[in-house]
């Protein structure tokens, strides 16, 4: 089983359960770009180029914060993937995510321009961000939150932010 139980929760070897790990910076950036429908420019490369397609030397604020391999030595082929305080602060209140979430022609903007109901919009955001439909409880809470928000846009943007900063999005499991 991938989840712990009372007999294996303290095990740190023998593969008795799966240890979630965060996505690599390039993978996470590409996932965020896909979910928000907003691409990052990478120097002279055409718009739509993914982070995984770029060479290591291409500047990227996000990849610098979330860790990427600089491959200066063979021993450093893999970047550090342990979350740190700087990453957490950027997830919680960084402008990077907010700009992508509220971008013109981004996912939320496209949902607002479509004829999708709140229920359909919630389902679409869940499928985009964490690859599953919301549970009935999650659907009800999200729907109530959107209805109570100052506007539909604010409610959907907040929901997308919550999904992008969730463990289910950030960790591979």
Enumerate the predicted regions with their spans.
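An acidic, gly/pro-interrupted, aromatic-rich
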Residues: 1-135, 168-173
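Globin-like tetrapyrrole-binding proteins
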Residues: 159
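Extended, non-catalytic substrate-recognition/exosite surfaces adjacent to catalytic cores, especially
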Residues: 153
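Short alpha-helical functional segments enriched in proximate histidine and acidic residues
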Residues: 162
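Amphipathic alpha-helical segments that form the core helices of the histone-fold
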Residues: 140-149
């Amino acid at each position: 089983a991938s989840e712990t139980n009372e007999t294996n929760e303290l095990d740190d070897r023998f593969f008795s359960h799966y240890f979630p790990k965060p996505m690599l910076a390039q993978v996470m950036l590409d996932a965020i770009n896909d979910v928000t429908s907003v691409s990052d420019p990478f120097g002279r490369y055409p718009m739509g180029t993914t982070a995984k397609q770029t060479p290591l030397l291409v500047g990227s604020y996000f990849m610098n914060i979330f860790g990427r391999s600089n491959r200066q030595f063979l021993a450093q082929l893999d970047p550090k993937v342990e979350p740190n305080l700087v990453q957490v602060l950027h997830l919680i209140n960084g402008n990077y995510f907010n700009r992508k979430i509220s971008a013109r022609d981004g996912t939320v903007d496209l949902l607002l321009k479509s004829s999708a109901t709140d229920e359909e919009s919630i389902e679409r955001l869940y499928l985009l961000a964490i690859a599953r439909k919301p549970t009935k409880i999650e659907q009800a809470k999200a729907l109530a939150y959107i209805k109570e928000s100052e506007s539909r846009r604010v409610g959907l943007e907040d929901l997308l932010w919550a999904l992008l900063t969730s463990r289910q999005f950030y960790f591979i499991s």
